[in-house]
Curated annotation (Swiss-Prot):
Domain of life: Bacteria
Family membership noted in the UniProt record: Belongs to the chorismate synthase family.
GO function term, MF aspect, one: FMN binding
Pathway: Metabolic intermediate biosynthesis; chorismate biosynthesis; chorismate from D-erythrose 4-phosphate and phosphoenolpyruvate: step 7/7
UniProt keyword annotations, A-Z: Amino-acid biosynthesis, Aromatic amino acid biosynthesis, FAD, Flavoprotein, FMN, Lyase, NADP
Sequence positions that bind FMN: R131, S132, S133, N243, A244, G288, K303, P304, T305, S306, S307, R329
EC number: 4.2.3.5
Reactions it catalyzes: 5-O-(1-carboxyvinyl)-3-phosphoshikimate = chorismate + phosphate
Name of the protein this chain belongs to: Chorismate synthase
Annotated organism of origin: Agrobacterium fabrum (strain C58 / ATCC 33970) (Agrobacterium tumefaciens (strain C58))
HAMAP family in the record: Chorismate_synth
GO biological process: amino acid biosynthetic process; aromatic amino acid family biosynthetic process; chorismate biosynthetic process
């Protein structure tokens, strides 16, 4: 199985499976001299880790990160400085229960990668989905923690903006609320609605989809490239690589089809400081594949978790018609924990483009 790496200069390779002894990543191309602490990496890991509320999988993983290479420890015993060599990070699996998946060893879960993995490779890891499990994304979040340090002033924040048909009221958007509830929800009025709704979904043994929005501020103007290396192209690609993601939009996205040219165009003026300013940001911070300096805004849609308790029609590896009901511990809405994953992927993509731009133009933005 190939294609386990992404990025060009800031290149991330992830490895490991959902029910293996461990998983991790190798970050290649990180510049020397980047300083960080394990606590800073762990902060982002803790946002993603399972078992933190009744609305996510009850699998209990501490997701403690170990840095194995690519750094030197400072005299304070906490701060690490990158040396420019590959940074390898490891996360141990401690709460896998493979016996829960015995009944689907030869059965394909509808909506899951079971069928296509078996079709392509002739073998699949049915224990939690192997590489197709969202467990793999823990390694991406670890890599994203390093990426955030590469670009000066970069601030990447995400929020859940829709669960099922229930959307937030954008007039109530408050970033301070995002870490105050189990949904990463910026609208405090929507929290009790989602709680009641997801309790019903969870008790029925079903699942539901969601939409995540990520905003990256401090993205240097001018990074990116035209045609085949657009910043928005690579952001879309990175987000689409996340498990269960079925759609991505940048800026106004699909809603721009409803706008006129006058409404959609981001008008400009010169500011009092002699720098250009945009009067709107329908483009989501990117024009012609190149960052404008405005916040980069992306949204991605996540399908409902395929592993559900409701019986569904399928087939087995012998070609028999069967009914499938998945046991085990699963997210009733995988979109909740996708928030820090989306943040990490955009951080890695911006870091990669930042280094590529620096190498091509020599500018330190």
């Amino acid at each position: 199985m190939s294609h386990n790496s992404f990025g060009h200069l800031f290149r991330v390779t992830t490895w490991g499976e959902s029910h293996g002894p461990s998983l991790g990543c190798v970050v290649d191309g990180c510049p020397p001299g980047i300083r960080f602490t394990l606590a800073e990496v762990q902060h982002w890991m803790d946002k993603r880790k399972p078992g933190q509320s009744r609305f996510v999988t009850q699998r209990r993983e501490d997701d403690i990160v170990k840095v194995l290479s690519g750094v030197m420890l400072d005299e304070d015993g906490e701060t690490m400085t990158t040396t420019g060599t590959p940074i390898s990070m490891l996360i141990e699996n401690t709460d896998q229960r493979s016996k829960d998946y015995g009944e689907i060893a030869r059965r394909f879960r509808p909506g899951h990668a079971d069928f296509t993995y078996d079709l392509k490779y002739g073998i699949r890891d049915y224990r939690g989905g192997g590489r197709s499990s969202a467990r793999e994304t823990a390694a991406r979040v670890a890599a994203g923690a390093i990426a955030r340090k590469v670009v000066p002033s970069l601030n990447v924040r995400g929020a859940l903006v829709q669960i099922g048909k229930h959307k937030i009221n954008r007039d109530n958007w408050d970033w301070d609320q995002v870490d105050q509830n189990p949904f990463f929800c910026p609208d405090p009025e929507m929290v009790p609605v989602w709680e009641e709704y997801l309790d019903g979904i969870r008790k029925s043994g079903s699942s539901i989809g969601a939409v995540v929005e990520v905003v990256a501020e401090g993205v240097p103007a001018g990074i990116g490239a035209p045609i085949y290396a657009k910043l928005d192209q690579d952001i879309a690609s990175s987000l689409m690589s996340i498990n269960a993601v079925k759609g991505v939009e940048i800026g106004e996205g699909f809603a721009s089809a409803e706008l006129s040219g006058e409404e959609n165009a981001d008008q400009m003026r010169m500011g009092n400081d002699g720098k250009p300013i945009f009067l709107s940001n329908h483009a989501g911070g990117i024009l012609g594949g190149i960052a404008t300096g405005e916040p980069v805004i992306a949204r991605f849609a996540i399908k409902p978790t395929s592993s559900i308790l409701t019986e569904r029609l399928s087939i087995d590896t012998d070609g028999n018609n069967v009914d499938v009901r998945t046991k085990g511990r699963h997210d009733p809405c995988v979109g909740i924990r996708a928030v820090p994953i989306g943040e990490a992927m955009i951080a890695c993509t911006v870091a990669d483009h930042y280094l590529r731009d620096r190498g091509q133009t020599g500018r330190l933005k």
